[in-house]
C-alpha cells in the first residue's frame, strides 16, 4: 500500500520543480511571503498537483533551512516540554544549545533563535500550503475538494501551533497577495481561533472517511485537531460550548472505528506500527538513501552509550526528576495526586534503586540506570552530563540501534525513519474525558475512558516484549484503574490531568496543557524553586505571566515597515 511517507520521498527525489527556488532563498523576512512559483494550466497535471500536496505535508518536518532550525523550532515541541516541569535541556553543558537553556530557566528574549525558528518554520509551512491551494483551486483535478480539505487541516494545525506559542501572529489565507502587509495585531486571538475552526469544519465535511495512502489526512484527522483546538479555547475561555464541541469531535474519531489503543505501550516506538492503531496525525519520517527525511527534530535527543555501543549521542531532552516522581503509584496502583495539574511534591525521588511501586510507563518514557534501554542495559556512562542533567534520557522517538529503520552513518546515531505522532488516540480519549469532567455531565464515562488508557499501561508489563524496555524482576510495577468510590468532579479533574502527564510525557503536550489550565506560572515556579536545591542553574530562575507566550521574533520587528506594528486589537 502507498503511504504519504513514500510520496514525500518521491517528491524530494523527483519533483523539486514543485517548490520555487526562491522559497528556500528568501529567508530575510518571514512575513515577506509574496506568492512565488506560479504554474500554467499545462503544468497543472495530476502529478504536479500531487507533488505540491506532498510538499505541503513535508512542511511538518520543519526542514526548510538545516538541521539546527529543525531542532530548535520543531513542531514536535520538545523544547516546550523543557519549558515545563517535565524535562531538562540536556546535552554536554549548560552552554550547549544555550538558547534552549534560556527557555528552560525562563530567560525569554525576542532574539532567541528558538523564537525565530518556531515562527519561520510554521510560516514557511503555511506558504507551502498556500502554494498548493492556489494551484488546486485553479485546476480541475480529481478529488479537488478533498485535497483542499487536507490542506485546510494542515493550515489549521500550523496556525494552531503558532497561536499556542505566540501571543500575536499575522493571519492570512491563500487569497492574500502580500502577507507582509498583514500586521500581527490585525486579528484578535479569538478571531484567529475562529479561522482555524472554520478551516477544520470545512475540512471535515470535504474529506473522505478513509484515504488510500496511509498517513494522508481523512476527515477524522480534522476532527481530532478540532478536539485539540476546542480543548484549548474551552480551558482558556471557560467555554461550555467548546467543551461540548470537544466531546462531539472526539466522538467522531472514536466512532469511526479506525483507531484503537496500542496493544503495548512500546508499540508507539516501533516503525512497524507507524500509521496504525493510535496514530491519527503524524510526521512522516523516513530512512532514505538521500538522508533527506529522517527525524531531524529528535535526532540529537539520543543517549550516549558505554563503549560507543550506540555511536555518538548528544543526549539532549532528559526527563526531569519531577516527571519521574509523578510515575510513583500507591498500594492501590494509583498515582499520588498531590497537585491540581499533575504536579507532584518532591519528597520522594524515584531512582534506579527505588523500591516502591511505579507505573510501567516510566520505563517506556525514560532510561534508568540498571534498566533495559531498547534491549541493552542502561548505565551511568551513557549519560553525557550526569552531574548537570541526571540520568533520565528520553526513550520515546528512539529506536534500537539494530533496527533496520535507523539511518546508517549519521552522527549522532539517533537518525531514523520512525514517525512522530502529533495527535494519537489516547490523547483524544483523555480530552473527551476532560470535557465530560469539566461539564460535569458524565463522570462515570470519563472514568471509563481514563481507565481504558490505564489498562493499556497495565497490559504492557511484559518483560519479554522486544526490544526489552522494562524489568518486572527489578521494579515493582503497579497500575490499576480508578474505582468508582470517591470519584468526584474535583478528584476526576486531578486524575485526568495527571493521566495526560503520564501517558503523553515528553511528547510535546505538557506545557500547552499547563497554559490552557491557567496553572503554568504557579506550577513552573514551584518546580524551579524545588529544582534549585538539586541543580544550581535553577537558582534565581522564575517565570511571570509575561513569559508564557513567545514575543514576536526580533528579526520580524526589525523587518516590519518602519520597525513598528500597529497597536494590538483589543
What are these model-derived regions, one by one?
Residues 277, 283-387, 425, 442:
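Glycine-rich, aromatic-lined ligand/substrate-binding cores of catalytic
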Residues 355-456:
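C-terminal substrate/ligand-recognition segments
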Residues 26-78, 334, 555, 559-570:
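Membrane-proximal, proline-rich intrinsically disordered regions
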Residues 148, 155, 226, 233, ...:
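Structural register within alpha-helical repeat arrays
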Residues 3, 19-48, 196, 227, ...:
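Bacterial Sec-dependent N-terminal signal peptides
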Residues 46, 50-54, 58-63, 92-166, ...:
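Conserved, well-structured interaction surfaces
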Amino acid at each position: 500500500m502507498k503511504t504519504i511517507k513514500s510520496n514525500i520521498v518521491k517528491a524530494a527525489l523527483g519533483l523539486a520543480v514543485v517548490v520555487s527556488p526562491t522559497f528556500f532563498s528568501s529567508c530575510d523576512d518571514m512575513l515577506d511571503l509574496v506568492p512565488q512559483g506560479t504554474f500554467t494550466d499545462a503544468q497543472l497535471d495530476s502529478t504536479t498537483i500531487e507533488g505540491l500536496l506532498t510538499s505541503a505535508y513535508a512542511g511538518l518536518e520543519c526542514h526548510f533551512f538545516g538541521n539546527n532550525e529543525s531542532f530548535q523550532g520543531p513542531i514536535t515541541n520538545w523544547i516546550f516540554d523543557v519549558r515545563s516541569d517535565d524535562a531538562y535541556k540536556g546535552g554536554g553543558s549548560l552552554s550547549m544549545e544555550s538558547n534552549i537553556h534560556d527557555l528552560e530557566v525562563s530567560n525569554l528574549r525576542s532574539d532567541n533563535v528558538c523564537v525565530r525558528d518556531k515562527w519561520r518554520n510554521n510560516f514557511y509551512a503555511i506558504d507551502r500550503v498556500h502554494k498548493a491551494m492556489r494551484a488546486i483551486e485553479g485546476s480541475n483535478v480529481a478529488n479537488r475538494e478533498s485535497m483542499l480539505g487536507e490542506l485546510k487541516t494542515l493550515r489549521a494545525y500550523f496556525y494552531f501551533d503558532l497561536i499556542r506559542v505566540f501571543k500575536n501572529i499575522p493571519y492570512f489565507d491563500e487569497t492574500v497577495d502580500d502577507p507582509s502587509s498583514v500586521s500581527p495585531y490585525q486579528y484578535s486571538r479569538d478571531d484567529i481561533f475562529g479561522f482555524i475552526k472554520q478551516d477544520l469544519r470545512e475540512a471535515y465535511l470535504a474529506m473522505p472517511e478513509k484515504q488510500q495512502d496511509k498517513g494522508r489526512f481523512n476527515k477524522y484527522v480534522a476532527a481530532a485537531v478540532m478536539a485539540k483546538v476546542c480543548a484549548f479555547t474551552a480551558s482558556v475561555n471557560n467555554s461550555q460550548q467548546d467543551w461540548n464541541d470537544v466531546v462531539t469531535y472526539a466522538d467522531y474519531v472514536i466512532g469511526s472505528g479506525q483507531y484503537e489503543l496500542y496493544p503495548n505501550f512500546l508499540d508507539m516506538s516501533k516503525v512497524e506500527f507507524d500509521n496504525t492503531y493510535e496514530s491519527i496525525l503524524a510526521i512522516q519520517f523516513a530512512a532514505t538513501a538521500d538522508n533527506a527525511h529522517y527525524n531531524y527534530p529528535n535526532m540529537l535527543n539520543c543517549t550516549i552509550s558505554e563503549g560507543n555501543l550506540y555511536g555518538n549521542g548528544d543526549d539532549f531532552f532528559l526527563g526531569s526528576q519531577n516527571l519521574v516522581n509523578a510515575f510513583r503509584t500507591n498500594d492501590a496502583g494509583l498515582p499520588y495526586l498531590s497537585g491540581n495539574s499533575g504536579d507532584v511534591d518532591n519528597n520522594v525521588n524515584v531512582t534506579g534503586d527505588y523500591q516502591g511501586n511505579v507505573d510501567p510507563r516510566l520505563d517506556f518514557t525514560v532510561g534508568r540506570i540498571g534498566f533495559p534501554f531498547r534491549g541493552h542495559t542502561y548505565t551511568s556512562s551513557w549519560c553525557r552530563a550526569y552531574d548537570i542533567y541526571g540520568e533520565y534520557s528520553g526513550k520515546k522517538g528512539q529506536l534500537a540501534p539494530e533496527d533496520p529503520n535507523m539511518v546508517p552513518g549519521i552522527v549522532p546515531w539517533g537518525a531514523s525513519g520512525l514517525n512522530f505522532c502529533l495527535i494519537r488516540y489516547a490523547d483524544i480519549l483523555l480530552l473527551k474525558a476532560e470535557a465530560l469532567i469539566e461539564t460535569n455531565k458524565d463522570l462515570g464515562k470519563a472514568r471509563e475512558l481514563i481507565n481504558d488508557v490505564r489498562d493499556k499501561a497495565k497490559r504492557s508489563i511484559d518483560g519479554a516484549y522486544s526490544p526489552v524496555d522494562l524489568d518486572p524482576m527489578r521494579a515493582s510495577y503497579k497500575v490499576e484503574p480508578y474505582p468508582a468510590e470517591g470519584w468526584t468532579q474535583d478528584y476526576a479533574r486531578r486524575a485526568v490531568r495527571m493521566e495526560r502527564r503520564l501517558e503523553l510525557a515528553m511528547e510535546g503536550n505538557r506545557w500547552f496543557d499547563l497554559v490552557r489550565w491557567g496553572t503554568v506560572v504557579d506550577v513552573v515556579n514551584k518546580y524551579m524553586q524545588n529544582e534549585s536545591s538539586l541543580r544550581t542553574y535553577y537558582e534565581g530562575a522564575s517565570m511571570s505571566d509575561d513569559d508564557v507566550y513567545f514575543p514576536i521574533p526580533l528579526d520580524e520587528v526589525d523587518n516590519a515597515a518602519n520597525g513598528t506594528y500597529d497597536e494590538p486589537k483589543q
